[in-house]
């Protein structure tokens, strides 16, 4: 618990923001280790605290034919190797209460997927690991819902919680990001994270050659959403990064190219350093007098 509290306080105090980044899913041990090295080198160079992210199982896929990953047992072994080899904290997601104990032995941050952000039993099981809990806001939820989700973590005895904006459904096959949510989600009284890659998904918006659909996305707009988020003053940036996005087995259209990671982060840091987004403006409504 002491190590968890230390990491949580370090992330809360990070200036101008902290980074949760990595490939969407574990494709192989070799690929994950290589990506962890590159992303750590870049984050160290630009001066951002990094928590490395990847998933062991993509349980919520559009198609049953979609790649899911190596599974929990093998995936956690690989993430443990990343943790040891590069001295990096780890964030990964859970989908069932039964996974939380095992995941909590490896992950420093347990992530609750957006579609599961209201699942009380899952939130409580994750909280009881004592690890930091990152709750993604459901695409169907108002930002105020995250106050309740965060409170479920605290009532389970765990004060180490953060909430994450990842877009809102806008009709079929599309998401939008409402920048007001970055401000309103602060009412959860915890760090606010912006997922700048999943926010550009187009769910089930890509037709496959063999029939069926998969998630598409608008990768070219990732910088737009990222600039907005850091200007508003979010505490953390979540992003998925890949060295070959066109060949990525999952969410390729919304993974940011590794070759452009340093360039984007440098720009975001520059924006974050000049904005006063983390300082709430006190509005004086008394009558103006000369």
UniProtKB/Swiss-Prot annotation:
Role, per record: Catalyzes the stereospecific condensation of D-arabinose 5-phosphate and phosphoenolpyruvate to form 3-deoxy-D-manno-octulosonate 8-phosphate (KDO-8-phosphate) and inorganic phosphate. Involved in the biosynthesis of 3-deoxy-D-manno-octulosonate (KDO) which is an indispensable component of rhamnogalacturonan II (RG-II), a structurally complex pectic polysaccharide of the primary cell wall. RG-II is essential for the cell wall integrity of rapidly growing tissues and pollen tube growth and elongation.
The keyword Cytoplasm is annotated on this UniProt entry: yes
NCBIfam families named among the record's database cross-references: KDO8P_synth, PRK05198.1
Thermal behavior of activity: Optimum temperature is 65 degrees Celsius.
GO BP terms, alphabetized: monosaccharide biosynthetic process; pollen tube development; pollen tube growth; rhamnogalacturonan II biosynthetic process
Compartment(s): Cytoplasm
Signal peptide: none
Keywords: Acetylation, Cell wall biogenesis/degradation, Cytoplasm, Transferase
Modified residues (N-acetylalanine): 2
HAMAP family per UniProt: KDO8P_synth (MF_00056)
Protein's UniProt name: 2-dehydro-3-deoxyphosphooctonate aldolase 1
Tissue: Expressed in shoots.
Activity vs pH: Optimum pH is 6.5-9.5.
Listed EC numbers: 2.5.1.55
Catalytic activity from the UniProt record: D-arabinose 5-phosphate + phosphoenolpyruvate + H2O = 3-deoxy-alpha-D-manno-2-octulosonate-8-phosphate + phosphate
GO annotations of cellular component type: cytoplasm
Single Gene Ontology MF annotation: 3-deoxy-8-phosphooctulonate synthase activity
Gene3D superfamilies reported in the protein's UniProt record: Aldolase class I
Protein family (similarity comment): Belongs to the KdsA family.
Organism: Arabidopsis thaliana (Mouse-ear cress)
Alphabetized Pfam families for the sequence: DAHP_synth_1
